[in-house]
Amino acid sequence: EQPGEIAIMIRYQDKASVFRGVIPLGVPVEGTPAESNFIDKFIFAKLKKVGMPPSEVSDDSTFLRRVTLDIVGRLPTVREAELFLKNNSTNKRAALVDRLISTEEYAEFFANKWSSLLRNKRSNGAQLRTTMAFYDWIKESFYKNKPYDKFVREILAASGDMKQSPPTAWFKQVNTQQAQMEDASQLFLGTRLQCAQCHHHPYEKWSQSDYYRFMAFFSRVGKANAGRPGEDMVFHRAGIAQVTNKKTNKPVKPAGLGSKELVISAVDDPRHLLVDWMKTDENRLFSKTLVNRYWKHFFGRGLVDPEDDFRSTNPATHPKLLNALADYFE
């Protein structure tokens, strides 16, 4: 027997159930550090359960290096190290974090990460203006601490040209209804719907109906030439939002995953209703996916791993902690 923890799936015909099996290391866990926040409470409880003593509290030099790398993507300067190591304040570590996340370097570092997630790239010289405008918008969003739901809404429901709305660049790279639906679901809800296009997975909950109804949120996106090479105007085309379910060959209207079809007027942009649903859905995938993505950034592995693959057969290692993080974020 090897100590550790693993998720085990049991299946019978078209039914499946998952539980996490644990073989404790068996070492007594005593004298854990003082809890700094609710996260420590969950982690220390898990360490005691599996019999794994916590690591020693890092020294100041190690803490400074790790935090600076994780928040602004570089090593601390000599001057920063001198000031931090000389500081005898009891809250200097929290103050360091607060200082770093208020810098332009922080905004630049995470703008690079989100540019990659949002496929913000240029395939030719004509797209340079668009690419840079979208990057600058992402950076400014982080620098001004824009609310996350507003950040997502301004991307998914972007309208206008590059000057009016830089996130319209997303529709340049993700340029089909299918790609927009699949990217939005995987990036913002941690849910991979690609397989549901062709069949209902025997062990997962999303069906072809879910796939096409979710796609219908993007069915009224229109694009036109903005007058410059490589730039488009994105707009809402008035009309009934619907797509054809290729399995039934019948039209379906927009619906959140596992939800009923929505009644949307011809003049309303369904993309706004998509973000409204994301924020309020009882599954809370919108919040859980983001906090899990940041957990992976800071700790190397998500509570759900891969970080964009939330499903019943891929459970979180710490489900209560994931819920608590989502609570705190909301």
What spans do the regions from the language model cover?
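Short, structured secondary-structure elements
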Residues: Q2-Y12, A16-K260, V267-V275, T280-E330
